[in-house]
Amino acid sequence: MKNLCFYFVDVFAEEKYAGNQLAVVMNAAKLSNGKMQAIANEMHFSETAFIVSDKKRNGGYDVRIFTPSNEVPFAGHPTLGTAYVIRHFIARGSASKVVLNLKVGQIPVTFEKAGDQEILWMKQRPPSFGKIFEMRELAETLQLEEKDFDCRYPIQEVSTGLPFIIVPLKTLNAVKRAKVNTSAFLSTAKQVQGGILIFSPQTYHKDNDLNVRVFVDLFGIPEDPATGSGNGCLAGYLSRYRFFGTEKVDIRVEQGYEVRRPSLILVKAETEGEILHVEVGGKVFLVAKGELT
């Protein structure tokens, strides 16, 4: 295998060594599926992204995303992190928008100046709403009591490309106490082939609107520090059920505190006609560069 360049970036971070870690491997066209999976397992981040070519196809760059255990059709923080690498190291800073060709389809990423930094925004597919779950099933899965759940809102599967079960809880204390019962979790998560996102309107920091934790054991990720795909699903859920009193959503979500990777995810949702548009944004920091030999 010819030496391949890779970058480490921190996504949804406010500074280096926070947020969600990502490895981005360049010029990966000649890597087999098995080799990509082996590299992702070696990196052992939540996901590793592979830029198949530095040439555009149909206006976008072909990208594949792997967790330590399998390939996924879409994931949020790899989308933003890979777009950052493409903009700075392939387009050399000249692109105002980068389009990724993922298994789920084309995902555009735009760049917004924020002082001497930039916020990356991705527009996700319109959310689809699936199965509604019984409270007692998630209480067993998360080892919580039924009184911890906010019964004003449903526990529901939502997907913008990767499904998540959205679970509303009343308090930050309940979010912190949640502990996955692995066998129950796998039984529940397999019903949607995705993860579980729990949230509360109580937060660690007063400037933030929600606190979130995400569990994705099904893909070899016990707890994810920052989840763009899951928070996109959450945005759709908040809009549909008017959690903030309106279907328009424009909020700050904190995640990752329980795994010592504090993260900030910016979340927007708005209905235009019959289409619910969802955007997720955050900052990206370059941490390291290296070579695979």
Predicted regions and their residues:
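Active-site proximal loop and beta-alpha junction motif in alpha/beta enzyme cores
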Residues: M1-F74, L80-T293
